[in-house]
Amino acid sequence: MHEDAMARGRFANAHREGDTVVRHPTADNSGPRALLRHFEAKGCTLTPRVLEASEAHERLSYIPGVTGYPPLTEELRSEGALVSVARAARAIHDLSASFAGHQAYEWHPLETCRPVGDPEIIGHGDLAPWNIVFGGTEVAGIIDWDAAGPMTRSWDMAYLAHQFVPFHLGDDISSWGWDSPPDRRARLALLCESYGGLDPEDVVDDAILRLHSTGTFLRQRIQAGDPRFEAQRHERHDRGFMAAAARLAAYRDTLLGPDPKGR
């Protein structure tokens, strides 16, 4: 059987064996597995199927396609891809809303703070390009559900918006494949409209909070000497997230334009 190490994975030491993926989660993954089984029972084709699971490993179905890593290709920077990721996220969010008994599971989100409000869905928690499988500009699947958990829709979409609108500012935009900044306000509006019923202001404010709290979380783990975060220490991810939060906060009013609520 053909084996292919998936070298870009940070934590689960994943490798492909034919049409399956073998992963070794570092924490109890019973919640995400139950969620994936719920998606399968609902007929969802956007998420991997759980084929085998134990405390030490899990075997999932492989979703063929291409994941996105910076610099993103022209296809993944397109409006078509932006619309597709918004609609795919809406589909899984709607299906997750009917997942009963989530209180029985321990979830492992990466962030240390959340906005005020009751959870609306079981979100993915890390909707970045490298966790989304594409066929051209269309989303073929959403993978790596280890950071899933109860949250609001805008909280999950905030990180997706950061990566796909994108909210990267300054010199950082070129490393993500952009020769010049796109019309972020228009792309944010397109993302929210394609998802349906999503408030751009909530998405931006949640993104600022998410980026800062992620940076704080990473800094705490790095300072604690957690070996799982050695790559993040070497690449200074904590500084990157906190700087991104500060830049986005300064750019907030420009991005949103006149206050739509008239305040």
Where are the language model's segments positioned?
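Conserved N-terminal boundary motif of the eukaryotic protein kinase catalytic domain
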Residues: 1-4
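A conserved alpha-helical element in kinase catalytic cores
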Residues: 8-13, 18-95, 99
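Active-site acidic catalytic loop and adjacent metal/ATP-binding pocket
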Residues: 12-16, 50, 112-156, 166-168
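Short, glycine/charge-rich beta-strand/loop segments that flank catalytic centers
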Residues: 52-56, 101-112
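Conserved kinase catalytic-core helix
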Residues: 71-106, 119-125, 130, 134-135, ...
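Active-site activation/catalytic loop segments of kinase-like enzymes and analogous catalytic loops
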Residues: 157-196, 211-222
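ATP/Mg2+ or Mg2+-diphosphate-binding catalytic cores
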Residues: 214-263
